[in-house]
């Protein structure tokens, strides 16, 4: 059935464009495109990408925003995000990955997810590449403008301050001008605001009992059949005001024959003002068991604390690019990009504790798939501020900054997508990166007894549970006022200088690559064969105390490394029929270690009496992961609005990186005198891991086989299944066990959307499923492995188009109120944390003219 431009609009146009891009791509890919209003119907880039086959998202600390991209089940550190062909710097403290909640979806005209690789692509991508193409003035004939405005209501409102409106405003303008409309300009701006709260119900840890006796967890201990008791119950309430601001501009020139030029710049900022309040009750001694799931503690201790985290992530860049045609089929492309990614967090922490007491005893009863029920012996004692003494208060400032300079020169001869016959691509790529991290901490300890009753509590009330006490709230303003009025009541902690210096590091990297790639475009076949030669020079500088027990004296250590990689790649496409396409691909890619793993140390714990040292140190000599990738994809396109595909992939990853803890005996370590037992936690390269998987995708935007109004239904669905064979982790007793999975990598993930379009009305109901994800692997016993439990969330969108320009939208986010849950236990049956972010509802207007 032929559909004209009037009939195809909105979400149908977006899906058609994405299908077309996948069909014409030289590699295995998927994607998402803007619709005719110039909008991807999501608020952040991460939310848009999680609808793409094989993509799942790591949520921002579990609190409701899609932040990092997991592709084909590979955690974010295995993947790369490009904007107009350039890998921009991270806005995190110790990871290389980009925070996608910083980038608005409105920036993108098209996002392609490349799952196989060519020699001209960034090689730091074992899982894949998300390539974002920004808007161009030449996407439209003449002037184009769009405005999008939404007002939102979050179900979970802030407790400590009055809630303010949530929503989004974005605008885009583009036009061509000058002689023959050879010049173009694009301007866009976006503001997003989320005013909400979250509740985290935390248990933290459990103890295991055999015959009424608490067991020390060791790697060989079999906990099957043992009684289980929670050690701590800790509600945490978060008040968050998140804001995203962005500005983007592009000036273009295209003479239509010889030369294209583009000068673009972007500034993106994401801020989070977070107020956290928590109170916990903790066991003292062992549980008195009633049966396997309930009992009581005769004594307990307690703590109440207040934290404020003022976080700002900023990404800014400027880019100049040009394409110069040498002949009818050949051109040279040149690109220069300067970028900076930064992260700053200002922390204020106030802590008050209640000493062990029988009046803080409590009973417990484990629930199935729910939090344990906690029954306090004396709720009045638990809630009395006179029983809590100040432990300390501190301020901490973290600053991380990454500067990059990228320069690319690429030559292409008869190798563009519309070419026929043999072609050639070759190029040189260079990148300079400078990463800096600095922490400054000031902690003050009370010189005497300071109770919370003396300081005063917060007047707000937070009562998360009907069957448990309201939180006893610390008021940071009253603590600060008390400290200012009583400066002699506090002394500086002796650890301030050490904690401020030991975590600092700086990394300088210079990488370059030269590649050559042959191409073939036949009537029914397409192929690429290439080789990329890449080098990486790195210098890492960090501080260590000298001697290791010192809190005031430090020495700088420096480490240099130089590595080279030969990275072959090949892709073959065969149009078996006009509607059926087969793809084969093989490649080698790398995965660079995180900044924290190669540069960041932590303060050592030195016991000069017991002659022991516990430390966590960086490993600047970590080698990058190396992956050999094989892919097979079969794609069927019955028409331009439907698709059915299956893709198989296999990856062998050498030099896998895991964090291991080892204990050795050292004589006179780090300037100390004597023979010490030294326990060291460090990221190291270990054995190989293999991952194989399969992806299924089915799209049909119109069920033409159904009668009447039912024919306007459509659907999209994709499923990714992963089968990893992981490297081994060293346990606390020196034994080895296979990791139960790849970190932050679900073995199963799926998306499904039900579509309906009839006349001016359109609707979309979307479901996103993410399977069990390993978050950390324990070295004492596997029961302490931490996971995100499987979760399914639902979103709904309704739209009414009044005319070609105006559209009214209604959206529901997380309409089933799915709660992210972190679990532990032999069968992941124990709730460790559950995060309630609530539902959100948006009412908006889109207007294009």
Question: What do the PLM-derived regions correspond to, one by one?
Answer:
Residues 650-652, 657, 662-664, 669-778, ...:
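Gram-negative outer-membrane beta-barrel transporters
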Residues 162-283, 303, 311-321, 327, ...:
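Transmembrane beta-barrel wall of Gram-negative outer-membrane proteins
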Residues 7-43, 68, 76, 86, ...:
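N-terminal periplasmic "start-of-domain" segments of outer-membrane beta-barrel proteins
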Residues 46-87, 115:
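Extracytoplasmic beta-strand/coil segments of soluble accessory domains associated
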Residues 300-317, 499, 503-512, 561, ...:
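Outer-membrane beta-barrel signature, preferentially recognizing the C-terminal barrel domain
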Residues 713, 768-778, 799-849:
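C-terminal beta-signal and adjacent terminal beta-strands/loops
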Residues 121, 137-143, 178-183, 257-258, ...:
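Short loop/turn motifs that connect adjacent beta-strands in outer-membrane beta-barrel proteins
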Residues 52-53, 89-90, 102-148, 198, ...:
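A beta-strand signature from Gram-negative outer-membrane beta-barrel systems
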């Amino acid at each position: 059935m032929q559909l004209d431009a009037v009939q195809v609009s909105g979400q149908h146009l977006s899906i058609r464009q994405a299908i077309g891009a996948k069909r014409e791509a030289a590699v295995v890919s998927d994607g998402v495109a803007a619709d005719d209003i110039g909008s991807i119907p999501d608020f952040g880039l991460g939310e848009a990408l999680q609808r793409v086959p094989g993509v799942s998202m790591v949520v921002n600390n579990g609190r409701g925003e899609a932040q990092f991209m997991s592709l084909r089940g590979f955690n974010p550190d295995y993947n790369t995000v490009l904007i107009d062909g350039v890998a921009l710097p991270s806005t995190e403290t110790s990871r290389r990955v980009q925070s996608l909640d910083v980038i608005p979806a409105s920036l993108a005209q098209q996002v392609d997810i490349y799952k196989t690789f060519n020699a001209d692509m960034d090689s730091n991508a074992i899982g894949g590449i998300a390539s974002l193409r920004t808007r161009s003035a030449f996407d439209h004939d003449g002037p184009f403008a769009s405005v999008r405005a939404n007002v939102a209501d979050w179900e979970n409102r802030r407790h400590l301050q009055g809630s303010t409106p949530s929503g989004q405003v974005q605008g885009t303008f583009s036009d061509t001008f000058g002689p023959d409309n050879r010049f173009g300009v694009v301007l866009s701006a976006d503001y997003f605001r989320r005013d909400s709260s979250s509740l985290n119900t935390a248990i933290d840890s459990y103890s295991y009992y055999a015959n009424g006796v608490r067991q020390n967890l060791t790697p060989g201990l079999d906990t099957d059949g043992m009684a289980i008791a929670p050690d701590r119950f800790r509600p945490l309430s978060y008040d968050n005001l998140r804001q995203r601001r962005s500005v983007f501009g592009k000036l273009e020139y295209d003479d239509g024959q010889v030369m294209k030029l583009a000068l673009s710049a972007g500034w993106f900022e994401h801020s989070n003002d977070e107020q956290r309040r928590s109170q916990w009750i903790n066991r003292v001694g062992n549980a008195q068991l009633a049966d396997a799931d309930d009992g009581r503690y005769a004594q307990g201790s307690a703590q109440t604390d207040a934290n404020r985290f003022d976080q700002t992530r900023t990404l800014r860049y400027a880019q100049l690019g040009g394409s110069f045609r040498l002949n009818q089929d050949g051109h040279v492309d040149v690109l220069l990009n300067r970028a900076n990614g930064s992260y700053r967090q200002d922390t204020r922490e106030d802590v008050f504790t209640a000493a062990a007491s029988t009046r803080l005893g409590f009973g417990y009863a484990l629930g199935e798939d729910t939090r344990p029920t906690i029954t306090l012996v004396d709720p009045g004692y638990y809630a009395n501020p006179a029983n809590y003494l100040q432990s300390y208060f501190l301020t901490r400032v973290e600053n991380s900054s990454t500067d990059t300079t990228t320069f690319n020169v690429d030559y292409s001869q008869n190798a563009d997508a519309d070419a026929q016959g043999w072609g050639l691509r070759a190029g040189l790529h260079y990148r300079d990166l400078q990463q800096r991290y600095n922490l400054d901490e000031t902690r003050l300890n009370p010189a005497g007894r300071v109770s919370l009753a003396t300081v005063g509590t917060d007047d707000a009330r937070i009562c998360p549970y009907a069957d448990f006490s309201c939180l006893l709230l610390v008021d940071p303003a009253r603590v600060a006022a008390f400290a200012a009025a009583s400066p002699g009541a506090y002394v500086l902690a002796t650890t301030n200088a050490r904690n401020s210096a030991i975590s600092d590091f700086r990394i300088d990297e210079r990488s370059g690559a030269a590649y050559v790639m042959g191409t073939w475009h036949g009537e029914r076949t397409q192929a690429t064969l290439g080789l990329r030669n890449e080098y990486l020079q790195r210098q890492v500088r960090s501080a260590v105390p000298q001697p290791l027990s010192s809190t005031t004296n430090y020495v700088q250590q420096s480490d240099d490394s130089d590595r080279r990689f030969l990275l072959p790649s090949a892709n073959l496409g065969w149009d078996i029929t006009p509607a059926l396409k087969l793809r084969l691909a093989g490649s080698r890619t790398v995965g660079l270690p995180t900044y924290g793993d190669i540069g960041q140390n932590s303060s050592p714990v030195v016991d000069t009496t017991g002659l022991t040292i516990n430390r966590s140190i960086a490993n600047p000599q970590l080698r990058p992961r190396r992956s050999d990738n094989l892919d097979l994809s079969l794609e069927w396109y019955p028409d331009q609005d439907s698709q059915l595909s299956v893709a198989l992939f296999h990856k062998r990853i050498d030099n896998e990186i895991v964090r291991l803890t080892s204990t050795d005996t050292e004589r006179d370590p780090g300037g100390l005198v004597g023979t010490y037992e030294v326990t060291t936690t460090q990221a190291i390269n270990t054995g190989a891991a293999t991952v194989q998987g399969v992806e299924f995708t089915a799209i049909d935007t119109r069920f033409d086989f159904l009668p009447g109004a039912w024919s306007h239904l459509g659907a999209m669905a994709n499923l990714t299944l992963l089968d990893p064979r992981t490297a081994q982790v060293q346990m606390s007793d020196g034994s080895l066990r296979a990791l139960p999975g790849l970190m932050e990598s679900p073995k199963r993930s799926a998306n499904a959307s039900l579509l309906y379009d009839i006349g001016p009305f359109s609707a979309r109901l979307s479901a996103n499923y993410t399977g069990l994800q390993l978050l950390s692997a324990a070295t004492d016993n596997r029961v302490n492995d931490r996971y995100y439990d499987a979760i399914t969330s639902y979103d709904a969108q309704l739209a009414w188009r009044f005319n070609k320009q105006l559209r009214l939208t209604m959206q529901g986010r997380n309409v089933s109120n799915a709660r992210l849950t972190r679990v532990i236990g032999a069968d992941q049956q124990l709730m460790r944390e559950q995060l309630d972010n609530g539902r959100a509802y948006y009412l908006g207007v889109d207007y294009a003219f």
